[in-house]
Amino acid sequence: MDGAPVDHHAQSGTEHAEQRLAEARELLRQSQAEAERLRHQLQSAQRHAAGLSERRRAAEAQTQTAARNNRRMVELLEATRAEIATLKENLDAVTHPPFTFATLEAVHAPREPEEGVETGAVVRGGADVVQNGRRLRVTVSPLLDAARLTPGAQVLLDESSSIVGVAPGTGSGQLLRVKEALPDGGLVLAGTADEERVVRRAPALEGVELRHGDAVTVDARVEWALRRVELSEVDEVLLEEVPDVTFEDIGGLGPQIDRIREAVEIPFLHPEVYREHGLRAPKGIMLYGPPGTGKTMLAKAVANALSARSADGERSFFLNVKGPELLNKYVGETERQIRVIFDRAREKADAGFPVVIFFDEMESLFRTRGSGVSSDVETTIVPQLLTEIDGVEALENVIVIGASNREDMIDPAVLRPGRLDVKIRVDRPDAAGAAEIMAKHLTADVPLHADDVAAAGSADAARGTLIARTVAALYDRGAGTALAELTDVSGTTHALHLADLVSGAVVADVVDRAKRHAVRDYLAAGQAPAALGVREGHLREAVAAVLEDQTDLLATVAPAEWARTSGWRGPRLRSLRMVRGVEA
């Protein structure tokens, strides 16, 4: 048997089987390890699921708790709301009329008390009011928004002195004049009998520019200026404007215009030339002469010329003072208004604007001192004007112009050199001047009747013919235009014709009457084109109407009075006898 051959084939199969067995064992071992790992993962997942389930149960419990708390909060809020409504009803029931009126001074927010100086009750918040002259610190009703309470307002206090409402303001109070505005915002006010007081501004006046002479209402209990009052007393007599009248708009006053330009335009527009020659600009101009001769228009043209010819192109201001309306029965009021007028002029002049102060009807304000019959108001008004005019010396852009047809009544101190330096007589126009004035009113824009245009050959020729014939009718010294016979103290008689009473205003009135007559005839003709326009007959009719008006006026006036107001320059008159309208 030892020598029997080995079966190699069987041996190889055994080794192969053992190898496969080992691989199977290894695979089994790996499977068991994988199974163990999966078992551990399963256990971990089961534990995580258990944790999630526990958290879910806890969340459900918290949700249920929150729902219970929410229900309790809703119930509590409803109960609180009902309690607040009840408290408001009780508070409204407690605060019932009557209420007391008071003026609110200030509102205080709560703050920490200063130890050793004030107690907690002082700084809890509240408001300061003035009631019947007493200053009180009161509480503000919790139903009010304290931030909306404005100092100076009228408030209502209940029986416990708590502010329960705001009352509408009355706007009334003592009326005082501003004398000076202080740097800290306070105001120095002037009252009656030279009384002065310093007051604070109410919130409504914060930032408002107040000038000297402005009127304000004052609550004397709190010493506050409440509001500015726009009084018309000064504005009615003072027209602050920039005139649009030029010298070219004025006819028949060539010599007077030349004198005004020499006296005003040159020193105001070329002050350096005047200074080089040792001259100063005139402080004022006096325009005098009969009524209706263009004195006011000249003053307006001066203001316009100062602005139109200024090197800087700045505008000017024309302060037109209506003299009679400036007079006031209260002592010192007229003087105060004169100061206000010059203060306004200084404001504009300080800003670099040329200013013209024009006093119309100057004799009504500044008549000769001591000439009054029932009172001597001029004894204080005239010195006030003289003081203001002398004060104008330091200003470069102010000139005073006075106009009057009774220059004999004005105080001589006003007219002396150094005050109203330049005196210009504005006399009645002659025939050439009247034609020039009429051309300013009967312009190319005014329609002329077709018959007159056809007869003259052109509209311009017809206009010239109408003006020439109308002026000839006005200045005719025949028997038909004689109005009265004047006798002077020497016994000399003078025939008074319509030509002696013609003024720029009369010429303008003639043209206006003719225009109205033309409109009347045009409408009466059913607005037929052939009836349109002014014709010679309308102008002659207007001259006749003016002649009748002058006749009626002369028949009712005394000779001496007529001589003073009409510009009569002959001897003193003794009598005036009407020759027109007197039946034989």
Swiss-Prot record:
Superkingdom of this protein's organism: Bacteria
Subunit note: Homohexamer. Assembles into a hexameric ring structure.
PANTHER family, per database record: AAA-FAMILY ATPASE, PROTEASOME-ASSOCIATED ATPASE
Encoding gene per record: arc
An annotated Gene Ontology molecular function: ATP hydrolysis activity
Coiled-coil ranges per UniProt: 10-96
Species: Micrococcus luteus (strain ATCC 4698 / DSM 20030 / JCM 1464 / CCM 169 / CCUG 5858 / IAM 1056 / NBRC 3333 / NCIMB 9278 / NCTC 2665 / VKM Ac-2230) (Micrococcus lysodeikticus)
Protein name as annotated: AAA ATPase forming ring-shaped complexes
Region (Disordered): 40-66
